[in-house]
Amino acid sequence: MAASTMALSSSSFAGKAVKLSPSSSEITGNGKVTMRKTASKAKPVSSSSPWYGPNRVKYLGPFSGESPSYLTGEFPGDYGWDTAGLSADPETFAKNRELEVIHCRWAMLGALGCVFPELLARNGVKFGEAVWFKGGSQIFSQGGLDYLGNPSLVHAQSILAIWACQVVLMGAVEGYRVAGEPLGEVVDPLYPGGSFDPLGLAEDPEAFAELKVKEIKNGRLAMFSMFGFFVQAIVTGKGPLENLADHLADPVNNNAWAYATNFVPGK
């Protein structure tokens, strides 16, 4: 079949020959043509939004200076700061945007997973080891790891089996996010909607644009939080809530500076 030059924008045409673009159709071996939506251009955000456009909030407020020409305020989380020029190349910028958003989402889930079990344990809920890095390490113990402290749920004794399950489950979700099959079609892999938006939060363009900003801001904070949790685990051997309680009880002796000056690796 000749190369296609025009994408379909509607599913019904009368008396008009239309060629299908390669990105909008796939020809199977039995001659069937399967259709797939192409990403439509997002509706422009209102010029009154403080998070988008040339007059958006900048990283240093009124002292920010002029932003790079390629940072136009089109995307959420663009505060006009890129001293290393990481976003100068459009393809690299698009790739880094996707990586950041995905890592933000995992970091938010991870931060919640680190804090919530410890919070429950401090309020009398008993389900085994509550400190995030100690709980996972129980899989290497002789008795293995019981999810939520209940052997009737999941009794894990093999790190390889857990790894395989994670690959399958996470791979299935990522496959749907990117490709959309078999559960449906995906217009934008970064914001797939559909089954990923059961509450319909993205139906209003203005609200959706603001939610994107909130997501990226909270996600960046969560990534820094996870880094802090890792450092705390290495230095103090305690969970984040216990470290917070220690700091509030004695801020002079329990702070980052005090631990940094007294920390000896391996002890």
UniProtKB/Swiss-Prot annotation:
Which positions bear N2-acetylarginine?
R36
Alphabetic keyword roster: Acetylation, Chlorophyll, Chloroplast, Chromophore, Magnesium, Membrane, Metal-binding, Phosphoprotein, Photosynthesis, Photosystem I, Photosystem II, Plastid, Thylakoid, Transit peptide, Transmembrane, Transmembrane helix
Task: Please describe the post-translational modifications of this protein.
Answer: Photoregulated by reversible phosphorylation of its threonine residues.
**Binding of chlorophyll a 1, residues:** W81, S87, E100, R220
Residue positions annotated to bind chlorophyll b 5 are Q166, F263
Binding site residues for chlorophyll a 5? K214, Q232
Which segments does the entry list as coiled coil? none
What is one Pfam family matched by this protein? Chloroa_b-bind
Q: Which residues bind chlorophyll b 1 per the record? A: Y59
Question: Which residues hold chlorophyll b 4?
Answer: Q166, R177
The name this protein carries in UniProt is Chlorophyll a-b binding protein C, chloroplastic
Q: Which organism is it from?
A: Nicotiana plumbaginifolia
The protein's gene is named CABC
